[in-house]
Structures are given as C-alpha cells and as structure tokens.
Amino acid sequence: MSTENNSELLYNNSIKILTDLIGFKTISGEDNTALIDYCDDILKKLGATSFRTYDVEKKRVNLFATLKARNSNNKKPIILSGHTDVVPVSKGWSSDPFTATIREDKLYGLSLIHI
C-alpha cells in the first residue's frame, strides 16, 4: 500500500473515531461507561492492556491503558492523559453539538478541543 493510501486511511480512521467520540453525551457528572467501553475496545485492538477504576456509584469510570512500543524494547514510554466529561451544552450552536459536522474543512462538535 502506498504512503498516500496509508495517509488517507489514517485520516479517515481518525475522522471516524473523532466522529464517534463526539456522539457520546458524557456531560460532567453523568455516566461515561459507554465511552470508556468504546475507547477500551480501540486500545485493545491496538494491543493495549488496560484496567479501570470506578466511582462509588459505578457510573463514572477511569481507564488506564498501556501500549508498548513496536519493534523495540528500548523506546521510552509516553503518557497521554485526558478526561471524558464535557461541559453542558450552551446556547449558540448552529448544529447538534453531539453530531460531528464538517464545514469548510473544519470539524465541529462539543469537546473537540476540550481535552
């Protein structure tokens, strides 16, 4: 497969994942289990190992995952950290904030730049 095809595939997969992520209504304080399940599934397909921690009510979940470097045991690890809750929807949206919308080569949706 050519580099151009690989780049296009990576771009399309990234847009698909971002589009899916925007669709999860994980407003602060609400259940985020479905989103964590989705992220865990993607990471496991990439070879990650993971574990979860829960709040007292078992509706807010933290996901910790480890993905080892490919082709080398000498590569240094990196840590990515983020959060899954979003702010409540405010006024002023011209489209559904939980539906990814592309306008003029820009992707819009609640939480896209929130991490």
Q: Which functions belong to the PLM regions below?
A:
Residues I113-I115:
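Conserved small/polar residues in nucleotide/adenosyl-binding loops
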